[in-house]
């Protein structure tokens, strides 16, 4: 399985009318991952590679630039256990937490999924990667796999087993004089590289308990000059002249990595078992056994690995301080910008700014004490707002919902335990609403839980006050508050979640844990509770006709149809105004989707986590098996993305939101955020500023041409300078796409072409020019 690195060449057309975010081709992907919690580092000459638990990047020492390395660049996975670079073969190995592997040779990425996909039971983790000439030694939870760089093949898999047949874990290996030394959970073993039956573990010799090396797990192994070093417990042993002797030991100092070059053996150590560590240090051991200790409790907080480059600079992976360099007593820190966490619960875009609520709840809707605060992505830069520097958030955790006021810069975040936060982006102010505004949960007096948020057409903020005696709260547009008890069934325990508001101002409220949907309408008299319309929707004709009461998400489309995501696919309320009539006219229906000649209920076998509506009224659906684009009426599956057919970083898509200006679709997954630039944007009221990208269209560009800033569903006509129409289409929301071909399917010739766009009733027109450049 091969993938090839590609370089995305951005074609920049000098025009002040283009916003930076529009200079992205249709169909391109961009990951948004955290880069600050480093766990592995590898020196590669001019480059240093650094891995976090969720991402990989390189740092260029010559120009101080970063390159983010992830699925859009051809890498196979996210979630990294470790990396290793071999200067002799110029090979980078990326070992993932799911046992997948990528080998990077120059500009080629070779995926090796066979450990991941194997039927091996038990631990398949890859704990260490070592090189010996053309051979890569992969130390795994079951033993060792050998891989040859030149042939791209594995000549042998060695299963390490004890007397009972249970697998032994290989922690690492080194090759000296054609002899493999493997550190395992049961001690040190050795075998000749050219042993014809190397896969037979009985051919391996046990070295623990002999020549001074004690019996027990060997956690690390390394060669420095002519000596072999092994770590047993807290002690580093050295093997010279046929004897193992204790070399270095201090109680409670745990060696976590060994590295060597021509000058030093480098030992990375942590003191104690706390997180962050009580202390960390790096030991430099020279050829005369002189030990230099580097300690800095500010910079070294949870040390993972240290390597040394040819210039004598130490490059350090630290969980709390990202990639560090150390030289002449000075530390420097390096990391590309990214979100502070990979976690996502809810997202929204307002005025081209992405807001993320990264809190957590479990399947039983219990809070998880997540203190990641909230995240903001504005003009290409991520910012985090949490307890560090924001004392107002000291008692706030688990932001799981977010709503934005489209009129201004106000954004509301709902905490599942810490109340409601009002954030003004422009003023950079925060205001917290808890006691006196929201009700606590009986039996949990300090917990003010917000399960969902939604603004109605008159800008009243509706709040799911989860578990409260009055589970619906309203912050009215004038700033006053109300609390409402809709009389939910006893077994619901007033547990309320996501809220959406339809065009009738009806509130559709998720009832978690298999309790259906609450619909509530104040009947245009918000202060008069006596005339309110209330109904709980569930199974049965006239009662909602839900095919399952396990409702995960809700969405209102542009035709005021209510799309409901459940544990068993999607159902739709086509006539939401009829839900109070107790007739089948207001019931939900499962749409039938055409799957290439046969029909079935839409995503009936999928757990649907989220639904988002784009500018063309199509639905982006996030499930536990990937992301789908569904047609406006739900009868066609237009796109399906998963980890096997796209750069999507995980099949578990928890939340989707869309930037209506750019067409960016943000997928929030259980492994982080990735964005996809697609064809539909929101239409504008007046199409006074039409953008075309790319423009000019250069000869080597073969992608689609985007025309955005249009009125919704505008008719678009493209003509040559003689006025002849060569292509005509309708905008998807506020954006039209053109493949650069005429009606006859051939590429448009070099020249200037006119774009004429007219809205649906003909009252608005817009004009733009496109320069096509070909090699003809």
Stretches found by the model and what they are:
Residues 47-50, 91-94, 135-138, 179-182, ...:
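Conserved beta-propeller blade signature
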Residues 71, 731-764:
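Short, surface-exposed loop/turn motifs with a glycine/proline- and acidic-biased composition
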Residues 270-277, 357-372, 418, 470, ...:
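Short, conserved, GDST-rich strand-edge loop motifs in beta-rich repeat architectures
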Residues 715-726, 753:
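Short, glycine-anchored, charge-dense loop/turn motifs used at functional sites
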Residues 684-717, 735-738:
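Glycine-centered coil/turn sites that cap beta-strands in beta-rich domains
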Residues 108-109, 149-152, 193-199, 380-382, ...:
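Short loop/turn segments immediately following beta-strands, especially the blade-tip
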């Amino acid at each position: 399985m091969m993938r090839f690195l590609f370089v995305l060449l951005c074609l920049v057309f000098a025009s002040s009318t283009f916003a930076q975010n529009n200079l992205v081709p249709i169909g391109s992907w961009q990951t948004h991952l955290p880069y600050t919690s480093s766990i592995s580092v590898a020196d590669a000459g001019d480059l240093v590679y650094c891995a976090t638990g969720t991402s990989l990047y390189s740092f260029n020492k010559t120009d101080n630039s970063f390159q983010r390395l992830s699925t859009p660049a051809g890498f196979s996975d996210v979630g990294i256990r470790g990396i290793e670079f071999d200067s002799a073969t110029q090979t980078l190995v990326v070992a993932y937490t799911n046992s997948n592997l990528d080998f990077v040779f120059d500009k080629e990425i070779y995926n090796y999924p066979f450990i991941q996909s194997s039927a091996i039971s038990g631990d398949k983790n890859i704990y260490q990667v070592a090189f010996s000439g053309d051979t890569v030694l992969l130390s795994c939870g079951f033993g060792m796999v050998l891989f040859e760089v030149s042939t791209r093949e594995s000549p042998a898999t060695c299963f390490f087993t004890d007397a009972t047949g249970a697998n032994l874990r290989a922690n690492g290996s080194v090759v000296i004089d054609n002899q493999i030394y493997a550190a395992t959970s049961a001690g040190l073993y050795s075998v000749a590289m050219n042993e014809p039956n190397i896969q037979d573990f009985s051919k391996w010799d046990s070295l623990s308990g002999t020549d001074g090396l004690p019996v027990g797990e060997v956690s690390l192994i390394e060669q420095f000059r002519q000596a072999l070093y092994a770590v047993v417990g807290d002690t580093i042993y050295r093997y010279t002249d046929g004897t193992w002797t204790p070399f270095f030991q201090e109680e409670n100092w745990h060696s976590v990595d060994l590295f060597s070059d021509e000058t030093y053996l480098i030992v990375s150590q942590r003191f104690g078992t706390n997180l962050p560590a009580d202390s960390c240090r790096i030991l430099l051991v020279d050829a005369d056994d002189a030990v230099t200790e580097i300690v800095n409790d500010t910079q070294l907080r949870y040390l993972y690995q240290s390597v040394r480059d040819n210039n004598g600079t130490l490059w350090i992976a630290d969980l709390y301080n990202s990639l560090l360099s150390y030289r002449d007593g000075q530390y420097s820190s390096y990391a590309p910008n990214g979100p502070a966490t990979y976690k996502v619960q809810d997202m929204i875009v307002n005025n081209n700014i992405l807001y993320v609520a990264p809190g957590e709840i479990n399947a039983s809707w219990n809070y998880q004490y997540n203190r990641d605060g909230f995240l903001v992505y504005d003009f290409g830069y991520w910012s985090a707002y949490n307890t560090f520097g924001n004392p107002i958030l000291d008692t706030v955790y688990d932001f799981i919902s977010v709503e934005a006021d489209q009129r201004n810069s106000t954004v509301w975040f709902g905490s599942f335990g810490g109340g409601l936060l009002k954030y003004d982006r422009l003023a950079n102010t925060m205001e917290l609403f808890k006691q006196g505004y929201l009700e606590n949960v009986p039996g949990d007096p300090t917990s003010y839980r917000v399960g969902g948020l939604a603004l109605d057409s008159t800008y009243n903020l509706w709040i799911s006050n989860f578990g409260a005696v009055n589970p619906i709260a309203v912050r009215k547009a004038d700033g006053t508050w109300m609390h409402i008890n809709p009389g939910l069934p006893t077994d619901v325990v007033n547990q309320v979640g996501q809220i959406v508001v339809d065009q009738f101002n009806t509130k559709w409220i998720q009832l978690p844990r298999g309790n259906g949907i609450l619909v509530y309408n104040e009947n245009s008299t918000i202060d008069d509770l006596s005339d309110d319309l209330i109904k709980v929707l569930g199974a049965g004709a006239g009662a909602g006709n839900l095919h399952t009461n396990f409702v995960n998400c809700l969405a209102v489309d542009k035709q005021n149809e209510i799309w409901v995501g459940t544990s068993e696919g999607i159902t739709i309320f086509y006539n939401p105004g009829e839900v109070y009539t107790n007739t089948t006219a207001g019931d939900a229906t499962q749409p039938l989707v055409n799957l290439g000649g046969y029909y079935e209920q839409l995503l009936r076998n999928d757990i649907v986590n989220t639904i988002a509506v784009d500018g063309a009224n199509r639905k982006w659906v996030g499930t536990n098996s990937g992301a789908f684009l569904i047609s406006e009426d739900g009868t066609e599956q237009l796109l399906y993305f998963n980890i096997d057919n796209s750069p999507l970083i995980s099949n578990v898509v928890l939340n989707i939101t869309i930037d209506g200006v750019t067409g960016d679709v943000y997928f929030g997954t259980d492994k982080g955020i990735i964005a996809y630039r697609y064809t539909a944007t929101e239409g504008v009221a007046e199409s006074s500023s039409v953008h075309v990208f790319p423009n000019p269209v250069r000869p080597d560009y073969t992608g689609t041409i985007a025309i955005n800033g249009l009125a919704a569903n505008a008719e678009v006509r493209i003509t040559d300078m003689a006025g002849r129409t060569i292509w005509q289409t309708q905008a998807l929301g506020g954006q039209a796409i053109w493949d650069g071909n005429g009606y006859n399917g051939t590429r448009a010739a070099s020249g200037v072409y006119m774009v004429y766009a007219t809205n649906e009733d003909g009252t608005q027109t817009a004009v733009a020019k496109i320069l096509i450049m070909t090699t003809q």
